[in-house]
Amino acid sequence: MVKPFVFQVAGYQNRGKTTFIKKLMENLRELNVDVAVLKHHGHGGKPDIAKLKDSHNHFHAGAVASLVEGDGTMELLGNFSAGASITELIHLLELFHPDVILIEGYKQEDFPKVILIKEESDLLLLEGLVNVKAAVAWPKCLERTRKQASVPVFPLDSNQFFDWFLEQILGWHNARSIAINKIVEEDQ
């Protein structure tokens, strides 16, 4: 199995990360790229979980995990008593065999990332985070971001980032394919 391309979308709260990921996912799905998403609940505390069906009732009654599956679709609720590392969560998503895993949040992690710049105060992230590969800026911050950034900067209201992102995925997958082909040839 080829490991998925892992990429983060980072930025402060209320900067449009979820909307940005949704648009990126829609574009990738049009190209038959399978995407999984890992979202960090950065609002403090546990995420809200609706009490809708039996699986939720099992979970709220004390099950350490509750999984419901039907017709190939599943929903999993779980409590990691010691917390789960981002690596463990990525491994869980890898079970679905995605081509790409998009991570929303987890700013301090060392995966390649794009930063969303909506306010001038967001520019601090360009220097404060590791493995920043690109920035996407709102119109009012675009020129200032371009002057300050040492990475490619794209306007929010264009497809330029998506085109750049596809090149990153294709380059990554091509490099992996070359390495895999070399291993196969050596085994023969």
What are these regions (language model features)?
Residues 1-43:
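Walker A (P-loop) phosphate-binding motif
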Residues 95-99, 149-188:
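C-terminal accessory "lid"/substrate-recognition subdomains
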Residues 108-111, 124-130, 142-150:
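Short loop/helix-cap segments at secondary-structure boundaries that form the rim of catalytic
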Residues 25-81:
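N-terminal phosphate/diphosphate-binding loop that engages ATP/GTP or pyrophosphate donors
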Residues 101-103, 113-118, 132-140:
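Short, hydrophobic beta-strand segments that form beta-sheet elements in well-ordered domains
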Residues 43, 73, 106-108, 119-121:
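Short glycine-rich anion-binding loops that position phosphate/pyrophosphate groups of nucleotides
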Residues 51-53, 83-87, 120-121:
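Charged helix-capping and loop-helix junction motifs
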Residues 78-108:
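Phosphate-binding/switch loop-helix module in NTP-utilizing enzymes
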